[in-house]
Amino acid sequence: MGTFLLLMAEASAVGGELAEGGAEGGFGLNTNILDTNLINLAIIITVLFVFGRKVLGNTLKTRRENIETAIKNAEQRAADAAKQLKEAQQKLEQAQAEAERIKKSAQDNAQTAGQAIIAQAAVDIERLQEAGAADLNAELDRAIAQLRQRVVALALQKVESELQGGISEDAQKTLIDRSIAQLGGGV
């Protein structure tokens, strides 16, 4: 601080000498830096203080409001994002539960359908076995009937051949006696 005052004093002395020389000639240059600078600084500081305070205050106020608004917007967006995330997680959980339910239902349906198919196959096999047995019995009955017809036909054929060959006398006599006995007469 002492150095500053010393410089001011020397500048004043030099400036005073120059000013005196300028006053003699009519026009002079005030080289007293401290005098001129102090006045200029006082004017600038006053202007800055009076007008700059308002401008700077308004600028800072606007800047603060912008920052506060940006912070509020960011907080609101963060809250909205958190809410949307929570909703999305709930929807995901619901979708996973629904998928699990559908999967279990499909497995149950597949198992039920498989059991139904197996049961139907067993019924079909039983029906086919019964139909096969019925067909076999029908074929057996038809074969037996054909054999009977064949036996009867062969017996008739034999009888006819014997009848055409004639009956022996003893057989004719026995036949006649039997017929008379049946009619009620006796021989």
Swiss-Prot record:
Record carries keyword tRNA processing: no
Transmembrane segments: 32-52
Superkingdom in the source lineage: Bacteria
Membrane topology reported for the UniProt record: Single-pass membrane protein
GO cellular component: plasma membrane-derived thylakoid membrane; proton-transporting ATP synthase complex
Purpose of the protein: F(1)F(0) ATP synthase produces ATP from ADP in the presence of a proton or sodium gradient. F-type ATPases consist of two structural domains, F(1) containing the extramembraneous catalytic core and F(0) containing the membrane proton channel, linked together by a central stalk and a peripheral stalk. During catalysis, ATP synthesis in the catalytic domain of F(1) is coupled via a rotary mechanism of the central stalk subunits to proton translocation. Component of the F(0) channel, it forms part of the peripheral stalk, linking F(1) to F(0).
Entries under PANTHER family matching the protein: ATP SYNTHASE SUBUNIT B, CHLOROPLASTIC
Protein family (similarity comment): Belongs to the ATPase B chain family.
Entry protein name: ATP synthase subunit b
Gene that encodes it: atpF
